[in-house]
Regions:
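Glyoxalase I/VOC metalloenzyme domain signal
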Residues: 1-33, 41-187
Length: 187
């Protein structure tokens, strides 16, 4: 899989305990300075890591977590962000070269070399990470186009967005808007 792991940072550490009180199937459990963290695998096989820490190095493995009382009105996480994505790539040097042209994404995309036929297939072939949409403050589309070179697939005629593909065939959509990042999966 192209998507190695989604790392989610929650605003309220206590909410992680509320989630754990529901006794989900977890693959790893940790204790950090702010509270507990855990890793789980989605039905689609995606690994999701949930934490509230400023520094992941502060996490220590746990065998189990005490169950807490969950407020009746707790429905789920109230506020969280995708901290970063671990993306599996077939050729680490090639992927690093591509992403070195996009320093604003360095905090979001952590590359790791892996093996597998599915790491370079098109989005329509497999259920996996297919697109990362980056909304920026108004930008000069020609500057981004020049940085990305031949990887650019489409430039909107009004210059408000462009689409490029990384070496793993993940589409990167750059759109003039609000400095946000969206992640999509293809079925």
């Amino acid at each position: 899989k192209k998507l190695g792991r989604i790392v989610v940072k929650v605003a309220q550490a206590q909410e992680i305990d509320y989630l754990l009180a529901r006794q989900p199937e977890t693959t790893a459990l940790y204790q950090g300075a702010k509270g507990r963290a855990f890793e789980a695998v989605s039905p689609q096989g995606d690994t999701i890591f949930v934490h509230a820490e400023e520094d992941l190095k502060s996490l220590a493995p746990l065998d189990s977590a005490p169950l807490v009382d969950v407020p009746e009105d707790f429905k789920g996480l109230t506020s969280f962000d995708v901290d970063f994505l671990e993306v599996n790539v077939a050729d680490l040097a090639e992927a690093e070269k591509f992403y070195s042209n996009l320093p604003a994404l360095a905090h979001l995309i952590h590359l790791q070399e892996a093996q597998g036929e599915d790491l370079q297939v098109g989005n329509h072939v497999t259920w996996d990470l297919s697109m990362i949409k980056v909304e920026l403050a108004p930008f000069d589309v020609e500057v981004v186009k020049e940085r990305l070179g031949e990887t650019v697939d489409f430039v909107h005629r009004k210059g408000t967005f462009l689409i490029a593909k990384d070496p793993s065939q993940i589409e990167l959509w750059f759109e003039a808007n609000q400095d946000q990042v969206h992640i999509s999966y293809e079925e």
